[in-house]
Amino acid sequence: MHYAETIAESHLTPAEQAKREGLKARKPYVAQKLANIAAMEERGEISPIIRLEKSYLCNFQCTHCSAEYYMDRHKKKVFKIEDTRSKIDLDFVRKLSKEADDLGLARFVITGGEPLVMKDFDDVVAALDPEKHYIITDTNGWFLDDARAKHLKDIGVEKVQLSLDSMIEKDHDNFRNKPGSYKRVLRAVDASLDAGLNLLLSTVLVKGRVKTQEFIDMCEYATKKGVGLYVSYAKPTGSCSDHPEFVIDKEDADILRDLEKEYNVFTHMTPTYGSYKGCITVKGIITVTSTGEVTPCPYIDMSLGNLRETNLKEVLARGMRNPWLGPYRPDCLIGEDQQFIKFHTKKTKGFTHLPVPWGQGFSDENNTLTDGVEA
């Protein structure tokens, strides 16, 4: 994902600077941690956003869902089994918040699943502690009306990331398998802005879509609303593993890079305010699953360890030691590196309880780029 908060303040626009000043007045500790990130990176330290998947409950069944294979409904349908692994609780979330704070980490994204169906959503926000961390939530927008948006702001959520997959109503609803979802998303956009929440629109790019007028219309809509449009490439994981025709090609990526010059549209690979970090595995993002496993990317289904057994500092160190994940790389590992995709597919195919545990996928033993990959 694209998070402007990671960049030095000297590169901010006036509007972004005003947002920073507002945060500084309301939450000085959080604002200072965000301001420290650039210096951390200059020292060679990492400050990944932490995606927290406490629950995979969802009211949608999206065609492109990267989390579908983690959901109980998928395991029951495909494997005829239930996931009996114990799930993380609020005490786990509080401990994670403290470990992250001790490392100077500043940002959490509550995701899933659909976070706003979680009965304990407010408790999760409180456990993360909005006075210590910048709290973001993903949502499909179905439940995000004026009252809910104001409530999110009141409990300490700073930013909402809304999923919008087409400016053509029937296409969006079909992609989401939810009639009426398009109208709900547009309602949620206005509700979020009216409540004073920071807002990011998120959309999945499938092959050929970037060449359509619909995609240009979405870029223009986001620009008109004054919000960024984050573009996620369809990747060969989750539900998309059944749709290889969704995966974009180089021509699509090149066209998108040209559009970035004209609109406020970006990917996780986009240079931000003069800073280019390349692939953000571990360095820029990690995911904590509902069973406490840590993956280096939302689309990589192999664990770096379980936080019930290993502390966050060591899990991050494992990731940075791994030759796939730690070094700078200009390409998207799971989206473009065919050797890694082959390795990932071999390790994850048919695995019933993702992610693949530490030692069975990633390990300190597979410490070269060819380990575990057949010729």
PLM regions: where:
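Short loop/turn microsegments at loop-to-beta-strand junctions
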Residues: 50, 282-284
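Processing junctions and N-termini across compartments
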Residues: 52, 56-59, 273, 291, ...
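Radical SAM enzyme [4Fe-4S]-AdoMet core and its adjacent flexible, acidic
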Residues: 1-9, 155, 159, 163-165, ...
